[in-house]
Amino acid sequence: SKERSKPLHIVSCSFGKDSLATILLALEHGEPLDEAVYCEVMFDKTISGEVPEHRDFIYHTAIPKLERMGVKARVLRAEKTYVDLFTGTVTRGPKKGMLRAFPICGKCYVQRDCKIRPFRQYQRTLPPDTVQYIGIAHDEWERLLRLTGQQVSLLEKYHFTEEDAKQLCRKAGL
């Protein structure tokens, strides 16, 4: 079997301006990029939890355009949906046995179970030296300070602010 000589490079992609600008910068500057990984939160088994206009943009504009540029897009989904979580019961802690109902801002089990968990499960299938590009702008210092290990912001590397990211996406038709 052939040994892999270079680490994989993936973009965590929400299809917002910062993650799309990260992809565009990688392409523009010849940065290694193996795939864009998007984790779609589903409302139920058939309906996306994304705002319909954003979902349409993702599937009908962004993914096809990225694939034409040579960027593979991978879509992850959790086994559980928003409805599963909303109607489920708490399994641990002082509220054990109670219905979950509406998620509490800042303690959002939907983010944890429908976005972070499937992404982490996927990450475990990747080599440990995989580099993860994160779309955090040059002017978002508090967020940049939270980057760890193999996480890299190309927006920071190339001194792109959120406004610069927006303009880059607009120029690219994204």
Feature locations, PLM:
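Nucleotide-activated chemistry modules centered on ATP-dependent adenylation/adenylyltransferase
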Residues: S1-L174
